[in-house]
Every structure is written in C-alpha cells, then in structure tokens.
Amino acid sequence: YLRTKDGGDDVAWYVWLTSGTVSETPPLDQFTNLVWSDEYNENGALDSNKWVHEVGDSWFNNEVQSYTSRLDNSKVEDGKLKIIAKKESYNGNNYTSARIISNTKKDFTYGRVDIKAKIPGKKGTWPALWLLGSNFKTITWPACGEIDILEAAQSNNFRVQSTVHHPDNYGGGDTNI
C-alpha cells in the first residue's frame, strides 16, 4: 500500500511464488516448483483470478487516502504492475491509491517468494510488501502472523526493513530481520 501526502510515483511489483515438498528443514534449492506467478503480460486491469482490490477509506495505518480499483490508481503496463498514488479529492479524502491483495485467491504455507519492485522515496509514502496470515479476519492481527518483506516508511527516513509480527511481538522489535 502507499500512504501519500504529496502525490506519488509509479511502483512496479513483480511476484513469483514457488513451493515444494517440505521436510523439517527444507534446503533452499528445494523450492523450485513454481506454483503461482503474475508476470503482468496483459496491459490494463489486474488479473482478477489472482488479485483483489480492497477499496474504501484507509483503515490500517492512519493513511490519508481512499483506496480504489480504478485504472488511475493501479494498472498493468509494459510488463509492470503500477500502483499510483494521486493527489485528488475522492470520497472525502485528498488522495487516492490502490491496495491489492491475493489472500482470497491463493494460500501458501511454505515456499520462496521472489519480488522485483521499484519503490518511491517521496515524502508521505509508505511502500510495503507483506505476507499476512489468511485467517486474519477470524483470529485477528497479530495472532495470524505477518511477515513484512519490505517496508520503507518515510517517517523512518526511508529505511527499508523486514519485520516478523506475532502475538508476543506485534511491534516487530527484536524480530527485525
């Protein structure tokens, strides 16, 4: 998601997920069976078989935008997913952006995630890529678990970090990796 106060940049997201048979301690080379991917080959709207837009006012981290499913805020173009934050009046907010999830389309237990992303470094942005437990609506956060693959909040001087959230450490703290 993006949090913006002064507009934003295009963000390119590429996601590949792979999986394999898991032993107690799987070797890294074991996860070579591609089980899900989106190469963003079709210009226009996202593949609705893989992605869902969460729309409405920002309700997670005090963002100041409305999330939309409009092509103005997210589209596939030239092999990239572009998430676009815009300064505009919409549903009582002064900014729009897109929040895109896959949890209603595909669940993963083990595997490797490969992502290539270009993230903005502008004032007011908070680009992030997360893995969130698919049961978050029934057991709530942080009991469902969350792995922040990448977060680069402007409020943290754009320091890129990864964090593991769990019931004993919902703020991350010493579980930063």
Labelled PLM ranges:
Residues 23-177:
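GH16 jelly-roll
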Residues 1-4:
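Short, aromatic- and glycine-rich surface loops/edge beta-strands on solvent-exposed regions
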Residues 8-20:
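Edge beta-strands of jelly-roll/beta-sandwich modules across compartments, strongly enriched
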